[in-house]
Amino acid sequence: MYSLFKNIKFPNHWIPPIEFENKEQVKEKYFKRYCELGFYNENSIKDKVMNSSSVLLSYYFFSVAKNDQEFNLGYDIMAAFFSTDDFFDGKPENYNNQTAKERIFNIIKNEGNCSFSDFNQNEKFLIKYIIDSKEYSKNNSNKQILYYKILQGWIDYVESLGPYNLLENYSYNETIHLFIRRFDIAYLPACDLAIMMVIENLNISIMYHPKYCLMHLDLAKSLSLINDLHSFEKEFLDGQIKNNYLYKIIEKGNDNKSFDVGSFDIGVKKIFNDINKLNQSAENYEKELLEEFQLKLNEKQFDEFKKVITASLLINGGNLVWGNTNARYSTKNSIFIELKEKYEESCTTYLNTKSLFG
């Protein structure tokens, strides 16, 4: 992993297997399949990057997937997320367009059965995910509950995009930023999908235990901060940096609005500290939940409960690994690529521009 992330503390059991066999062949297979379905353009570099990101994220987020059907669900929900994010992020003409949101809500309301004559790319992926996950979950009541919970989470995610994009117009407020970000990052529906893959007979009411809910709140915030570190370079190059958490910290701490090695170092260390506190809190909840339910459940139920907890935690570890291995955040022309690889020695080379706060 890049040394930029060496000070982030993750328990080992949160990290999924890093080696991905036949990775390039899997990417090629999925890109060809979705070109044939009309989701991708075979000549589009953007589509190739999104396909690569979706394959890798499905592998690292959903390492609990047991078969191609579950891997496909992971791919589709991630591709739907990426394409929806690209459609709305930093584009007020889209996130202020009520019709664009209503089309998505119509797809969800009708569970993928829509009468539109044409679809945006993000709508195609969402429809495919909804139809396939409904079929996947139909014979298990727990999975059906999660199927609907994920759709609710997708509504919350889409509704958060407008407020999140408006944050750049207001002074930095850490509490508000992280509150919106826990929805905007789409962690919760992704996590519920991972749990859907492992839950069978466990009483699903356990997922509404206060400690379980608080653990997920910490995990969602932690994931959003790690994602902001991963995406800093991409958002800088795209001109969409002003809502990045690291940017906000640097901006708040600089009266002269300069972007130098010192301010960057302070900002990164604060995020490391925030992430580590959140991870430690989540790990404490994990331990407390396991201790509590080991006394309440029989051996078979407890084994399933541990799988549910693990599926949640692997999302965060998978996000840490994924962001360091995909083209979406690691482009060759990135002004921060060397910074990621060799933090202390390279930061003075690149972090010497005032245009960041223009």
UniProtKB/Swiss-Prot annotation:
Q: Where is this motif: DDxx(x)D/E motif?
A: 84-89
**Record-listed E.C. numbers:** 4.2.3.-, 4.2.3.198, 4.2.3.73, 4.2.3.86
User: Signal peptide: which range, if any?
Assistant: none
- What does the function comment of this entry state? Terpene synthase that converts its substrate farnesyl diphosphate (FPP) into the sesquiterpenes beta-elemene, valencene; alpha-selinene, 7-epi-alpha-selinene and a yet unidentified sesquiterpene.
Q: Which GO terms describe its molecular function?
A: metal ion binding; terpene synthase activity
Identify the species of origin.
Dictyostelium purpureum (Slime mold)
Record keywords: Lyase, Metal-binding
Motif window: NDxxSxxxD/E motif: 227-235
Its top-level enzyme class, in one word, is lyase
What InterPro entries does the database record attribute to this sequence?
Answer: Isoprenoid_synthase_dom_sf, Terpene_cyclase-like_2
Q: Which family does it belong to?
A: Belongs to the terpene synthase family.
Q: What is the protein named?
A: Terpene synthase 12
Which GO BP annotation is one of this protein's?
A: terpene biosynthetic process
Catalysed transformations (reactions): (2E,6E)-farnesyl diphosphate = (1S,2S,4R)-beta-elemene + diphosphate; (2E,6E)-farnesyl diphosphate = (+)-valencene + diphosphate; (2E,6E)-farnesyl diphosphate = alpha-selinene + diphosphate; (2E,6E)-farnesyl diphosphate = (-)-7-epi-alpha-selinene + diphosphate
Q: What is known of its domains?
A: Contains several highly conserved motifs that are important for catalytic activity including the aspartate-rich 'DDxx(x)D/E' motif and the 'NDxxSxxxD/E' motif, both of which are involved in complexing metal ions to coordinate the binding of the isoprenyl diphosphate substrate in the active site.
Q: Does the keyword Cell division apply?
A: no
